[in-house]
Amino acid sequence: MTSWVQHPSMVQTLITIRRARWTDAEEIAEVHDAAWRDAYRGLIPGRELERMISRRGPQWWMSAIERGSRLLVLDFNEAIVGYVTYGRNRVPSLPSKGEIFELYLEPEFQGLGFGRKLFEAARDDLAAHGYPNFIVWALGDNERAIGFYDHLGGKMVRCAQERFGQEERERVAFAFP
């Protein structure tokens, strides 16, 4: 999927959403690092956050791509600035067939409609592969994520606890028809 974005300065910029390639692993790791620090600083204990980020370096992403994980990237002027991962729902007790596992953008690209574009691309691919309905989990304290998925029409269907070191945080599942 390729589209043009019109900036207020009247400059057109090409964005592309496409399947990740192994050569994207380094940039995806950089997006992951920046987005997680921005989204979870103060929500996930510092040591746990650093541990989680460090596990997802370029080698981890290269392996995910080589395994055939469903992973789309948003390419903005030939730079990866966002990604989304998705597949079969991991919680069988929920009726949704699919799941968006992660959707992240570089912090400076949030609020520009790029997250919606990644979401819609993942939604369309899930539907094309037999997953017409899906869920997305977000930390309950992550107000931006909660607002984003609510704005897109998600309905809160489940709350669960997730442990980060010695602390627990609530996470919320949003269902999309």
Where are these regions (language model features)?
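Active-site acidic-Proline motif in GNAT/NAT acetyltransferases
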Residues: 106-108, 112, 140-141
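Conserved beta-strand-loop-alpha-helix junction that forms the acyl-donor binding cleft
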Residues: 136-145, 163-168
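Structural motif
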Residues: 31, 129, 151-152
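Acetyl-CoA-dependent GNAT
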Residues: 15, 19-25, 30-108, 116-121, ...
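Terminal substrate-recognition subdomain of acyl/acetyltransferases
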Residues: 2-7, 11, 170-177
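Short phosphate-binding/catalytic loops that engage adenosine nucleotides
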Residues: 114, 131, 154
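Conserved GNAT acetyl-CoA-binding A-motif
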Residues: 127-137
